Amino acid sequence: RVVEGPQATINKVIIKGNNRTHEHVIRRELYVYPGELFSREDIIRSARELANMGHFDPEQIQPDLANVNAEAGTADVVFSLVEKANDKIELSGGWGAGMIIGSVGLTFTNFSIRNIFNWDSYRPLPQGDGQTFSLKAQTNGKYYTSFSLSFREPWLGGRKPNSLSVSLYFSRQTGYSSSYRNSYYMSNTSQMYDSRQLMLTYGLSVGLGRRINWPDNWFTMYNEISFQRYQLKNWPYYIFSDGNSNNLSIATVIKRSSIDNPLFTRMGSEFTFSLTLTPPYSLFSNRHFEAEKDQVKYR
């Protein structure tokens, strides 16, 4: 005979196997809590959130029960985890059009900025808070150079799943020399670049993301404001050659993702809606820019 008893209550939530990731970073992603009624759906959802963090092997996340007390109607929920290396090092190089192209990039996906001055936490860098820190540089010498830096905090303030993203970007590009374009250009690579033709690009973006519970709790919303500034000097490849051009934009991204595994998806769906807008500058300044010169219209 099978006799149905009272619904079980969760006694403890136990986490095992986290060697680098701090325990509070893991617990804040869970949907099961001590004292709540047992829910298989919440345990599956918790395992899915842990898999999507990217710090653990999704195929080895094993939620299980322990210390089951039938008389008291309680049980412990145990999440056994296996940490995996998710940081990235990018090194690339090539040769083409008479130039060497090289790039280097570093991405740390489990960074801890609060421990940056705590030397005991370096393994080899401060880790465990689930933050993402990225650096990248690319150059081919005199013609083109770029640098970018980005940082993402998935839980701003540590209490709610509101993310903060900040990125910076800079690039420097020169134009092609007129000597390079003549019929002897194959032997004139030393005169390929013209430092008198120059474009500098500066970029900054700040974004805030949050999880939303309507129409269901699979949705996220991300809002970003970005600014780019272009400084041109004798630049023949744009609508004007000298001056500055600025671009301010606001973007909103609404995403629904219910996939069970980011790498080997077996179930779920994902879709994204995005919208990017620029402010109506003519309304703010009460000017009709269609009659202005390009240097004024696009500055």
Walk through the language-model features, giving the residues of each.
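Structural signature for solvent-exposed beta-strand/loop edge elements and short helix-capping sites
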Residues: 1, 7-62, 153
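Short connector loops/turns at beta-strand edges and beta->alpha or beta->beta junctions
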Residues: 5, 18-21, 111, 171-173, ...
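Short, cysteine-centered beta-strand-loop-beta hairpins and adjacent loop/turn segments enriched
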Residues: 9, 84-88, 282
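Acidic, glycine-rich loop-and-beta core segments that form the ion-binding/anion-interacting portion
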Residues: 15, 26, 42, 48, ...
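A generic structural motif
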Residues: 34, 139, 193, 279-283
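Short, contiguous acidic/charged loop-to-helix segments that flank catalytic cores in large enzymes
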Residues: 34-37, 90-94, 294-298
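Gram-negative/organellar outer-membrane beta-barrel architecture
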Residues: 39-264, 269-270
